[in-house]
Amino acid sequence: MNRSGQVFYQNWLAGIITENEDGYFFQYDENYLQQPYAQGISLTMPLQNQVFSSPALFPFFDGLIPEGWLLDIASENWKINLRDRMGLLLTVCGDCIGAVSIKPVIEENHE
């Protein structure tokens, strides 16, 4: 299953995070990289054209997911397994504390 989210920095589309059977991938948006206001979303993910890849969800993105009782409430309300980190990221991080937010990319089924 492929799942993706648009990553916004200060309401500007900064890039796309994707999960597939090979792991997790993040790539900055080409237009974002050309802007004078462009900043890396994390010190561990500096601005670059190359794709970042990881077998597990990047620690920066995992850190955006709530913890403790708030995570329990989110998991129960949206019926998301606590181990489904990408599902949690896409569901609860649309309005995070801080400059970064994640909006799910909805794939249209063209049959």
Report residues per predicted region:
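Phosphate/dinucleotide-binding and metal-coordinating scaffold of catalytic cores
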Residues: M1-E111
